[in-house]
Structure formats: C-alpha cells, structure tokens
C-alpha cells in the first residue's frame, strides 16, 4: 500500500448556473467513490426520465436530494482521488445551508474551486453586482480559504466554441476582482474546461490546442499543469495544527451502558490523549479522559481532523452539552467569553442592524443568541480601514467592527489563534444574514467550576 495519501478538503463555489454540479459530478464519477452499481442505477433512471444524455449533474442531484432529506449518504460519494490526494468536497453551494456550513463547517476547506461559465452573457450574470460569484469568493477569503483554483467552464458553448479570446477575457476580469478581494492571481490556476464534455478535466483537451497549460507562482514553490485534476494535485498540503493548545467542540454527548459519559466531537487543534485532564468550557468542568475512540477503535492520540468519542469519569450527561469546548486544563485551557469583538460582514438583511440587535450566532458547534452591544465602526471590506465611527446602523453589504455579548455562556476564540472557533454565521429569519471573524475575546474568570475526583487523582498522581 505504501503511505496513505493526504486528505484535503475543497469547497466548490460559483454562480447558480455555472455548471458546478456537472463539473463536480464529473470528478466524482470519473475518479471517485461512486460504485458501478449506483451509477448503473442512476443511468437507468436518467434514461427512463428522458434525461438520457445522463448529465453528471444527475449524480450530484441524486446525492444532494438524499443529503437534504437527511439521509446520511455514504460520505465516500463526495470523495475522489488525484495522484497525490484524497479529496473531499465538503459542500457545494445550492445546498440550502451552504453559507452556514462553510462557516461552522466540520472542516475548513483547504482550497476553493471557483467555477465560472464562458457562455455568452452567462459569465456577466454571475459576476454582476447581484451574482453569487463575488459573494462566494469573498466568503471563502474572509473565512481563511487561502488557495483558489478557477475553472472557466462551458468552453464548448462560448462564441465561437472553445474560443481563446473569450477565455482570456474572462481570465482577465476574474483576476482583477479576486485581486480586489485579497487573492493573488499569480498564485491561482486558471483552467478552461467543459465539465460536461470533459475537456481539460482529467485529460488535456484536443479542442483547445491554444491552451498551453496553467502556471502558478508562490513562495512555497511554483507549479504548472494542463488540467483541472492537475491543479487539484498542486494544492499545497494543509498544515494540521497539532502544536496548538487542544480545542475540541462537542457535537453530542452520549451515555453508554457500562462505559459512562461519552462526549463526541472533532479535534480542531492540538492533541487529545487518554489520561489528559480536560476542562469543558464555558461550564468549567474538569475531569480525566479515560479513553479515546475513533470508528470503534481505541486511539493513543487524536489529532486535528479526527472525529472522536472519549470517555470521561464522574461527569453526567446532563452536565455537558453540544457547543461546549474541551481543552487541556493545564495548557492554555478554553474559557467562557464575557463578550467579544468581531468584524462582521452583512450579507442579506432586509432592514438595518442597530445596537441591541440579538440574532443567533452559529460558531463551531455552538448555537447561541448574542447581542450587538455596540457597533463601533464601519470598515472598508477590503482594506479594513475605518470609514465611519459609531454608525447608527449597518445594512447589507456593510462591514463593521462590533462588540457582541452572548445571552448564555459561550466559548469562542480569536480567529488568529484558533480559526475554527473564531468564525461565525449570524442567523435570523432562517437564513444567514451576516458572517463574522472574531478579533478579540474578553474571557470570564474561570474559577469555581466543578473538579471531579478523577481529575484530582490524576493531577496528584502526576506531581
């Protein structure tokens, strides 16, 4: 077998008709985890429904429908392989909770793949003021997705088909606006593709002899290639933050007969080992970890990205809940936040947001109402410079520095230090009205929580 390939996560973004589904479907179909049986079943259904041309999007629509109905599909279906990586598509827009998922997402995307359509008028619609292309790209950048690949799709339907001039025009335009957002176009691979016909997806296209390949320049090393799959292969591998302090937001807490209380969650930073004396913030409960398991196997250590269950002593299920964060009680432990300051970007709020506004914040696994106590300043989204002090209100399109006060105990961190615990979605009226990145946290004093017998014993034993 040799060494297993590195796992990376991508998010696919772009306007609604850019062909994201077809492109993604094509990759999953050709290099992915969909078994032959499933494909034959889908193809047969497609034939019967007169969708005989069997668009790859059909695969994705089927998967998406199942995902939305809450059927947990075998996650392998959202995976495919390149020469170097196992790639997981963590979400594709069009999914109702895409923005929220991207922010609270169980995982940070290592790279965003932006799909734009080359058809006449299509590209212009996507990139126009109300197109989703800009918003998705801005979101990706704001949320710390530093790598980008651009697929110029539907090259088969440009005027004339496979037009070099059209490709160059789009490349120039996209370069200029991703630069405004904060990406460096020289480090972005641009690939002219047809997700439907397969041009430059896995094999160099014979329809575009003018395309000599893509090149990227970056301090970590330059790269070049011909196809979209090459570009995915050239993504820089993520550095998983094992050297940081432990942060593990709880997704669930189970009571398991004969074992006891088992919190479950994903290690975001640091390392969790049996014997660690953990503290759960914001409740400030301290206890010892007896064992750590993943996929029913005992682990000697869990690292960032691992979804684990761990058994804790002398703590009842009632004392822990989703949204709490586990950390090492002896190494920069997590604490509850009294209040925090964040840069907030308002995406789509029908009215105005003023001091006192109290929506629900989704941050990591926590879901808690927070009050906009003070809107301190309006800032320019790109440069971060102040444009207005103490504004009366903010509205869609604005970015602002805001002081927020949680209505119940909440554990969050500065984005700089712990990115997964430092970005949030602002939800109101069943939609994401804003996104935020936490600049600074004013922590509560962490004295006076429960310390279990197991924790005391473990601590004594180590002296």
UniProtKB/Swiss-Prot annotation:
Region annotated G2, chain positions: 70-74
SUPFAM superfamilies: EF-Tu/eEF-1alpha/eIF2-gamma C-terminal domain, P-loop containing nucleoside triphosphate hydrolases, Translation proteins
Location of region: G4: 153-156
Pfam family name, one: GTP_EFTU
Binding site for GTP: 14-21, 91-95, 153-156
Keywords: Cytoplasm, Elongation factor, GTP-binding, Nucleotide-binding, Phosphoprotein, Protein biosynthesis
Region (G3) location: 91-94
Modified residues (5-glutamyl glycerylphosphorylethanolamine): 301, 374
Principal subcellular localisation of the protein: cytoplasm
Transmembrane segments: none
GO MF, one annotated term: GTP binding
Domain tr-type G per the UniProt entry, residue ranges: 5-242
Compartment annotation: Cytoplasm
Residue numbers spanned by region G5: 194-196
Location of region: G1: 14-21
PANTHER family with a match to the protein in the record: TRANSLATION FACTOR
Family the UniProt entry places it in: Belongs to the TRAFAC class translation factor GTPase superfamily. Classic translation factor GTPase family. EF-Tu/EF-1A subfamily.
Official protein name in the record: Elongation factor 1-alpha 1
Native organism: Drosophila melanogaster
């Amino acid at each position: 077998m040799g060494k297993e390939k590195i796992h990376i996560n991508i998010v696919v973004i772009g306007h609604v008709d850019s062909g994201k589904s077809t492109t993604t479907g094509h990759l999953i179909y050709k290099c992915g985890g969909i078994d032959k049986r499933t494909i034959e079943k889908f193809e047969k259904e497609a034939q019967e429904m007169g969708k005989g041309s069997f668009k790859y999007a059909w695969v994705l629509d089927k998967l998406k429908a199942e995902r939305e109905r809450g059927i947990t599909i075998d996650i392998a279906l959202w995976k495919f392989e390149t020469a170097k990586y196992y790639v997981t598509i963590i979400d594709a827009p069009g999914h109702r909770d895409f923005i929220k998922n991207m922010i609270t997402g169980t995982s940070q995307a290592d790279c965003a793949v932006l799909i734009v359509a080359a058809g006449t008028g299509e590209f212009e619609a996507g990139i126009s003021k109300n197109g989703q292309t800009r918003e998705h790209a801005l979101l990706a950048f704001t949320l710390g997705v530093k790598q980008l690949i651009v697929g110029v799709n539907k090259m088969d339907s440009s005027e004339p088909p496979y037009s070099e001039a059209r490709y160059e025009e789009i490349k120039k335009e996209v370069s200029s606006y991703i630069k405004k957002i904060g990406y460096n176009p020289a480090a972005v691979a641009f690939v002219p593709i047809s997700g439907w016909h397969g041009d430059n997806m896995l094999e160099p296209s014979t329809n575009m002899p003018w395309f000599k390949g893509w090149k990227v320049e970056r301090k970590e090393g330059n790269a070049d290639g011909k196809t979209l799959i090459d570009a995915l292969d050239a993504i820089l591998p993520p550095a998983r933050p094992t050297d940081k302090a432990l942060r593990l937001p709880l997704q669930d807490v189970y009571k398991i007969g004969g074992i006891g209380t088992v919190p479950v969650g994903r290690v975001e930073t640091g390392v969790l080992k049996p014997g660690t004396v953990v503290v759960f913030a914001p409740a400030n409960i301290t206890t010892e970890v007896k064992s750590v398991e993943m996929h029913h196997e005992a682990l000697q250590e869990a690292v960032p990205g691992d979804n684990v269950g761990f058994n804790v002593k002398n703590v009842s299920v009632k004392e822990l809940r989703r949204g709490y964060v586990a950390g090492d009680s002896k190494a920069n432990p997590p604490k509850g936040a009294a209040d925090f300051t964040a840069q907030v970007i308002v995406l789509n709020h029908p009215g105005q947001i003023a001091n006192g506004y109290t929506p629900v914040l989704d941050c990591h696994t926590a879901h808690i109402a927070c009050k906009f106590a003070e809107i301190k300043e309006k800032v320019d989204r790109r440069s971060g410079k102040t444009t207005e002090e103490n504004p009366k209100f903010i509205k869609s399109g604005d970015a602002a520095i805001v002081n927020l006060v949680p209505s119940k105990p909440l554990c969050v961190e500065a984005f700089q230090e712990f990115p997964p615990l430092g970005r949030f979605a602002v939800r109101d009226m069943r939609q994401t009205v804003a996104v935020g990145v936490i600049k600074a946290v004013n922590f509560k004093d962490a004295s006076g929580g429960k310390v279990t017998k197991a924790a005391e014993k473990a601590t004594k034993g180590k002296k």
